[in-house]
């Protein structure tokens, strides 16, 4: 079985083609600037990169180019389109309806469309991508894998906001959580790595990238997560503010004479560590400002980022009445030993101690960085959302036979 994984953005498509027999990535790539001048597809096979600049007026043309790349005489990996067993689509928002991945049919498409108001930037391109794939591969089964699905096990007292209940009834305002596919993959991989059943563990998974979230995983299920109604909630991120007093929103609107859309843009795209530092949304630049340049604002942004994560680790340990495993993943979580060191500092009371030498030597593979005598296992687990999507797709399509 060979599955194509598609992640459609408003002007881009990320893709991977995976042989599920041994979970080998046969090809992967990125289509950029769809509908914009200078559109390009970058296709990678066996470590070689093939870049093609060509006009792409829409997502259908872009997906046709992806299929052409997979079938290419020089660097293709299949001879016939029928070798694509199924397509797994990453969908950001599935609302309350889906706690698992599902085979896409008319009802599922309607549900994804119904969630457009909850994810106006993400769900519309997903819908366009699915429709394009259906046109080009009408006989290939399609599966929707939702970022929100893993968090549907969160109890109501953790996902409800203390505003009039009628707004939940009318508008479904509640915590949804995101990065669910990553948290699901990483929690299961971490349990397997330490030889335990995920159902027997209390874990905190820290997905730390430009977008960042933390999830409490108890007995294999999400019981709380830091992101909320939108991905703006929770931690201080690259350009997102994270949690703060809601009154700040109306205060800024009044003081700056801006509307709801403008304040939303400010909090999503001009805040976070970039807003605090005035330097960058990239943690590498912030670390340089902190350790090398001794820039006060960079030092502040770095400290705020780490502090918020430490806060959530403590909170979720309390929620689960204990902690067996702390896991770091995502671009920063996997690659920044400095951030991991700062976050785990002075966490002895929770039984968290890391070995500095092991922490400094992480290298893109699952690693245990716990110090000897640490009651909590501290792990670095590279995430692989595409593989999780491909696995879910395999499971669902396999049941059709």
From Swiss-Prot:
PROSITE patterns: ACETATE_KINASE_1, ACETATE_KINASE_2
GO BP terms: acetate biosynthetic process; acetyl-CoA biosynthetic process
Protein name: Acetate kinase
Biological source species: Clostridium acetobutylicum (strain ATCC 824 / DSM 792 / JCM 1419 / IAM 19013 / LMG 5710 / NBRC 13948 / NRRL B-527 / VKM B-1787 / 2291 / W)
Catalytic activity, EC: 2.7.2.1
Function field: Catalyzes the formation of acetyl phosphate from acetate and ATP. Can also catalyze the reverse reaction.
Transmembrane segments: none
Annotated compartments: Cytoplasm
Sites where the protein binds ATP: 14, 207-211, 282-284, 331-335
Pathway assigned to this chain's UniProt record: Metabolic intermediate biosynthesis; acetyl-CoA biosynthesis; acetyl-CoA from acetate: step 1/2
NCBIfam families: ackA
Site (Transition state stabilizer): 179, 240
Cofactor: Mg(2+); Mn(2+)
Active-site residue list: 147 (proton donor/acceptor)
